[in-house]
Amino acid sequence: TSIYVDMNQTVQVVRDGDGGHDTLKDINEIYGSDYGDTFKGNGNDTLRGLAGNDTFYSGGGSNLYDGGADNDLFIITSSTQGQDSLIGDTGNDTVDFSKVTDLVSPTKGLEITLNGNEEVISKLNGVDSHKLKGIENVTGTIYNDTIQGDSNNNILSGFGGHNTLIGGAGDDTLVGGTGTDVASYETSTSGIKVDLTQINFQVTDDGLGGRDKLSGIDTIVGSDYADTFKGGTNSDTFIGGLGDNWFIGSAGNDYFEGGTGSDTVDYSAAITNLVVDINDGSKYINSYYGTDTFKNIDGIVGGSGDDTLIGNSGRNTLIGGSGNDTLLGYGGDDYIDGGSGSDFVSFAYTAKNIKLDLAITDVQNTNDGNLTIKSIENIAGGAGNDTIYGNDSNNTLRGGYGNDTLVGRGGNNYLIGGLNGYQIVLGAIVLGTTYSFALEGKTVSYVAQNGDTKASVLKALENSFNANNITNSYIVNDGEKLYMSDGSEKIYIL
């Protein structure tokens, strides 16, 4: 059976596994049994566990503990007991620092980087502590620890404090403790994939060829490559690195922070109407998705609802999805794709003189940045003097404030001016096209007939306004331009 060795006592005692108690004198090296032995060192002792799952407790002096075969546990009980050498040998071996509570004014707790069968030195509060070799697993202290694994399948546990755990290669298990704990992948050589909804491995690709299990982790720091992060039901923090990162929204109150690349938040699974604003510090609040907070985010992917997506002054990518979406780039050189549905691009935030042509799908200078638009049917201008052109679809063009020019082109278009007057350019007269205009709250319509010209359409509209008893308006038709005003609103139809 197993033996028990305590070298800390004045009379060193061994329970020999056969029911006897042996007293040792001037003995410095002990070999254990093939079973689960327990050793407590003191002085410059050499204690070897051989086979079995052995347990070693650190003591005074500089001892050598050799676990031998099987899965051994080395427990460090103090920071002042000397520099022991801990050899895991074969098996899956663990060093436990959780009983170290005597650091004086610590600014750091445990610092250690495992390296397989190569000897490494741990530090406690910046001071060399123990020598480790052949150790796979580490449990930290009550202080703020930094624990890094190697190419083996490591189990790294934070215990107390605010800890940083770095798994390295292999299929690792990273366990947070009572503080705020970080799983860091800054040493990965390719992008990582994180999905906290998974049961077995929450990091399905650690960027080093392995997969990791996460428990009690509050923050995940990505690599310098293109990472993918998906949250779970808890409140998680995801921090991207230098690559182009993808953050997938889910339940829980999450914090998404991009890096220096092009970083995107993805709500494509959402079926409710979203309002997402990626200006730094902005919060997106939704009954299902919770409250998400953004920093250094460049792009948004909406869901199947009628979403409002709000960019920032940087280079944004806004993708609406399948609903009827409203997209606001907020300046910068943006790419905006409305997706399916009837989508608006809005410039309501600016007083610049916007010039935009929906028929142009390549980049165009809008006076508010170089904009590329896809699958956009509708435009809302701002407070400037805007010039807005439609395309062959059914467009809604809103002028906003300012003296605006709205050009519908083909399709059945809805052109809405602003308070300071606007021009509506008819373009070519198309047989069967319906022309509708509103003044004094009354709407008139005319369907183009065979042989109509611009002048005949203008005359028909003039007659329709007069026939609808629009008596408080001033209407002038010179054959080239129909001018109407009710005192507050002015319309020019060219």
Regions found by a protein language model. Name each.
Residues T1-G19, G36, L73, S78-D128, ...:
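GD-rich hexapeptide-repeat beta-solenoids
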Residues T1, M7, G17, G32, ...:
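Glycine-centered beta-turn/loop sites at beta-strand termini
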